């Protein structure tokens, strides 16, 4: 189960505890932080990471939206991620307002190079949020997908994801 784009753990932890009471389920929680590494509710990345590690309820932590890739790389570089599974899905950059619309310039090269830096930090799951599109992700697999694996987490066969598509 993946909780995405949250600003604190207040609503996640009670639900994660309930989910855990039902069985062994992989739980990921992703947060949106600003360029200084804080959520809208004022929690720092290091506080979120420390709480997630200490809770015993959440298997992985992620950061999505809120920042561009180079800011997120800088923030992640300063964190003690330990053995957590970590995801990073920043925005393509920062949107510009033109009239009544928000636009992201095509900066897929910059995005992918910054994401390669993130992958080299040992982040397990990488992707994109606002302003990215399938072309970004395709380029990302070609660029950051070649980054060497920096750290390997202990294999947890009991938590391997299985998927099934059903059309009932």
Region annotations inferred by a language model:
Residues 2-168:
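Domain-level signal for soluble alpha/beta catalytic cores
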């Amino acid at each position: 189960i993946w909780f995405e784009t949250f600003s604190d753990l207040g609503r996640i932890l009670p639900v994660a505890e309930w989910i855990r009471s039902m069985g062994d389920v992989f739980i990921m929680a992703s947060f949106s932080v600003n360029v200084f590494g804080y959520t809208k509710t004022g929690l720092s990345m290091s506080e979120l990471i420390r709480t997630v590690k200490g809770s015993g309820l959440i298997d992985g932590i992620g950061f999505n939206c809120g920042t561009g890739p180079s800011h997120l790389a800088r923030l992640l570089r300063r964190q003690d991620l330990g053995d957590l599974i970590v995801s990073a899905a920043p925005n393509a950059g920062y949107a510009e307002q033109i009239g009544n619309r928000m636009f992201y310039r095509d900066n897929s090269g910059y995005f992918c190079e910054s994401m390669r830096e993130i992958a080299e930090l040992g982040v397990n799951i990488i992707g994109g949020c606002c302003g990215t599109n399938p072309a970004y992700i395709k380029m990302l697999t070609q660029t950051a997908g070649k980054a060497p694996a920096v750290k390997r987490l202990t294999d947890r066969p009991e938590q391997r994801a299985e998927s099934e598509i059903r059309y009932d």
